[in-house]
Amino acid sequence: MRPLSLLGVTALLSAPALALRVAANQMWLEHTPVAYAIKNFYKGDTATLVSGGVASLSDKTVDLGANAETQGLKNYVRNKNYRLIGIIVEVTYRLVANKAAGINTLADLKGKRIGTMTGTSAEVFINQLLSSAGLSKGQYTIVNGAVCMKAPCGSGTFPQQLKSRSIDAYGVWETAVELGVEALGENNVVIFKNASIYREVYSLYSTDEKLKDAATRKKIVQFVRALNQTYDLFKNQPDKVYSTVGQLIGVDVPVLQKVWDDHKWGPGSLGSDLVDYLEYEEKYLSKADGRQAFTRAELTKFVDPTVYQDAMKPS
């Protein structure tokens, strides 16, 4: 197995000249197929995982970035050369609420304090979910906090805020929500989720320039093939990866197993249905960011299925 190289962004320039450089936030579950593919399946020269995400593509030494679709769209505003080339995982986000706060339905969240990470996919999730119940911004209060991925969770983290009743509910990525369930007990919480209203589309990104460079594109295609092998394990033989994934992000395996099924591992669809979904989310993002929404033509250009198509051809 290939050794996995984990470096900070500041170390990018010292990486080998031929290394494929992939940027992702290494704290979250969503990135783990990237790390696993590098260590176990990538057949290119070398690959290096560095801290970052889609925004790291502004550094020309970075070939690929991994992030939620929310950050992809936000970065596309000023970087029309960015391309979404693959889906790593689609995640059904959950909102956990304290029943003792009088919450049994989404409508009961009116006037409540809801924890989330502003400016992220989690905030989009909260807005879309509550909008489906007829609640608009101003009818509830958003509270920032810290994400805890492994118990015990300290002061200021969402699970602790929920337990102390400084917030009534929160929604963010896993395993943080599951820890909120455990903090209060399953019988004392209510869970809300709806993938048809919001799901995180954690994706792989590159730039138009990288994809037009034959040597770089070849490495990227090889990496997508490695990801496809990883997805197969994550979907069909998760028992083989639970321990490794838990170690990568510092979470307990029993908690990880409870949230695994809310993660639909790639490759996902890069067709018109994805563009439909991005167009739907873009209506909210453009209004929230005070800018003009992307046209459907611009969103269609943003999604580039050709790398995945190349990866599916015999090597």
Feature-to-residue mapping (PLM):
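Fungal secretory targeting signals
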Residues: 1-19
